[in-house]
Amino acid sequence: MKLSTCCAALLLALASPAVLAAPGSCERIQSDISQRIINNGVPESSFTLSIVPNDQVDQPDSQVVGHCANDTHKILYTRTTSGNVSAPAQSSQDGAPAEPQ
């Protein structure tokens, strides 16, 4: 019985750092994702990344781009509005860009 108690205590001691490190891992993952987006040519001022619990994922104009903390939190990408971002050109039915009218 003492052996099983010792094993349980050891498992709890080893698991605790992983649970405590979860918020730090979210920050690290968020930073990695942000750097990838910036490396793809998106200005840092034109998006935000936020870490939210799974039950708060349904936010307008946001999309999930990552997860962390043993999949208990999601990382959301939201495009911010800035005057220098142009809207994509609409195309006509034949696939050619539409002419302004």
UniProtKB/Swiss-Prot annotation:
* Segment forming the signal sequence: 1-21
Superkingdom of the source species: Bacteria
Sequence ranges of Polar residues compositional bias: 79-94
Q: Which UniProt keywords apply?
A: Signal
Keyword Signal assigned to the entry: answer is: yes
Q: Where is this region: Disordered?
A: 79-101
The protein's name: Uncharacterized protein YnfD
Q: Which organism is it from?
A: Escherichia coli (strain K12)
Q: Which gene encodes it?
A: ynfD
